[in-house]
A protein has these predicted regions:
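Bacterial N-terminal signal peptides that target proteins for export
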Residues: 1-6
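Membrane engagement elements in two modes
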Residues: 7-170, 174-182, 191-238
Length: 238
């Protein structure tokens, strides 16, 4: 199972000056640990009446599996920290994985934000391959509303790349807002003929106002010939 990781600022500054920005981004994904961990396992006591789960699919790769959940906000206000619970079953219908273990990073149990009347894809790339996972279902829990407009964050130039023989996607995140984005998650979904064939995510520890930061996401699945979709839901609201 490949861990998705983020580099702390001090480690980023310590990288050799001869490294390219892209190499630093790759090192960011490979060597650091996302520190926002859930102290307790995820429990959804009440399903959201504002968020619809439009679909949930499982993607298989050589080093594990990943779940992609498509969500829609049916309300007139933006939402933050949307809890998402997934249940993965094998072909016989037995549950083999749920994302409710204590210690999971927040990004593996929730979506940072969801715009009013907007849609988003959330990715859990830490689904173990043990137990022969075959299907996944998801529910979204109640989440707090955001007052005002969400800080604007955009992803540009998403394209296939390769790191140490592994399929990856690279691109740039730009923070167009005045709010520093902390622990910003970039989700990448690869579709071929409308079907999800690969997915992954990257975590950027910090994106300052007006800054552009490269990312690299390791992908689970087979992205060859697929169209990449990348997004970075707002994580910090000022």
């Amino acid at each position: 199972m490949r861990a998705t990781v983020a580099l702390a600022l001090l480690a980023l500054l310590a990288l050799s000056g001869c490294e390219s920005t892209q190499e630093k981004s790759a090192q960011l994904e490979k060597t650091a640990h996302h520190t926002h961990l859930a102290e307790r396992g995820l429990t959804i006591a009440r399903q959201s009446a504002e968020v619809s789960v439009l679909g949930a699919v499982l993607v298989h790769g050589s080093e594990g599996a990943a779940a992609v959940v498509t969500l829609r906000n049916d309300s007139a206000h933006a939402l933050r920290d949307v809890p998402i619970a997934i249940t993965v079953k094998n072909a016989q219908g037995s549950t083999v994985f749920q994302n409710n273990a204590p210690g999971l990073e927040a990004a593996l149990t929730s979506l940072g934000s969801l715009p009013a009347h907007g849609m988003a894809s959330w990715v859990d790339d830490q689904v173990p391959a043990t137990g022969d996972p075959a299907t996944v279902t998801a529910i979204a829990g109640v989440s707090p509303a955001v007052s005002g407009a969400l800080p604007e964050v955009e992803v540009a130039g998403a394209h296939p790349s390769e790191e140490s023989g592994s399929a990856t996607a690279a691109g740039t995140v730009r923070n167009r807002s005045s709010v520093t984005q902390q622990s910003l998650v970039v989700y990448v979904v690869a579709r071929r003929a409308g079907r999800v064939v690969a997915t992954g995510r990257a975590i950027l520890p910090e994106v300052a106002p007006g800054a552009s930061v490269p990312f690299q996401a390791f992908l689970v699945g087979t992205p060859a010939g697929a169209r990449l979709e990348a997004s970075a839901p707002t994580s910090t609201f000022g």
